[in-house]
Design a protein with these regions (language model features):
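Non-globular, low-confidence helical/coil segments that flank catalytic cores
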Residues: 11-280
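Sec-dependent bacterial lipoprotein signal peptides
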Residues: 1-12
């Protein structure tokens, strides 16, 4: 009788812990860092690690510290959405410290190929490839789909259209991610013309979460874009010095969207079978 009671007590004590461990095993963590008006999203399920953009040059150490805190020792996929300094600046730091299995970058030549951030990025990538620290590099023109465990990635380029003569923000890769029924969209810095093209081409799909394009800068196609995406959550990468535009915030409020600003701190996103949880 005593043995039976002890067994029941042990079973009751262990079951919640096992459930918690199972939930932790299936959890995807996404950190959108507070690094001013710059982009860096770190994504990991504990096995696969993805980094989307790398902030400014001075952000490299902070990005590295955030990755270390998440237990990341190598990068499976490093995705550069476009070649502005607030998206590639920290890449040399990451390419020197971490082994990168695959780097994906946009297939265009920036207006200024002599810009310090771009030259530093190219030099660091060349060195990483020569030293075997970057397994492969792919310039994405059309689209690339990848599936790793419970993570599905789709990376969309411009399908050969070159916007760089006018505004290379529009050459941004747009990254969508699915995990256990939860959907996320990282829209780089796309602006009015690219949004117009993507809407007309049917390349905008609904999702649960949106990293708002171009740091919350308003344009007249955002309302149509937000309506099509129909997200529940949004994050804007901005700073007190360079805040999101009020018109953009008003559109998000009108959509009933729960909006986070990185000027208020790093955004912590957790995706599980139960849904999406976001804290700041």
């Amino acid at each position: 009788m005593i043995a039976a009671l002890l067994f029941c007590c042990l079973f009751a004590a262990c079951t919640p812990k096992n459930d918690a461990n199972e939930a932790l095993k299936d959890m995807l963590k996404i950190e959108i860092l507070k690094i001013g008006k710059a982009d860096c999203s770190i994504i990991t399920d504990g096995t696969t690690s993805i980094v989307v953009d790398c902030g400014e040059e001075d952000d490299g150490a902070e990005i590295s510290a955030a990755m270390d805190a998440l237990g990341i020792s190598s990068i499976d996929y490093l995705i550069i959405t476009h070649y502005d300094k607030d998206h590639i600046g920290g890449a040399p730091t990451l390419l020197k410290k971490y082994k990168v299995s695959k780097l994906l970058e946009p297939d265009y030549t920036p207006v200024d190929t002599t810009a310090y951030a771009y030259v530093s990025y190219r030099n660091a990538l060349t060195e990483a490839e020569a030293n075997g620290k970057c397994g492969s590099t792919e310039a994405v023109s059309d689209s690339v789909s990848l599936t790793v465990s419970d993570i599905k990635l789709n990376i969309v380029g411009t399908f050969g259209k070159d916007y760089a003569k006018n505004q290379d923000n529009n050459d941004s890769l747009v990254v969508s991610l699915e995990h256990l029924g939860n959907s996320f969209l990282f829209a780089g810095d796309i602006e009015k013309q690219r949004i117009t093209d993507m809407l007309s081409q049917g390349r905008v799909q609904p999702c649960d979460f949106l990293k708002v394009p171009h740091h919350g800068v308003y344009n007249s196609k955002l309302e149509d874009y937000f309506s099509k995406v129909n997200m529940k959550y949004a994050v804007i990468t901005c700073s007190d010095k360079n805040p999101a535009e009020q018109k953009t915030l008003d559109l998000l409020t009108a959509k009933g969207c729960r909006t986070f600003l990185t000027s208020n701190g790093t955004v912590h996103i957790r995706s599980t079978k139960s849904g999406i949880d976001i804290t700041q």
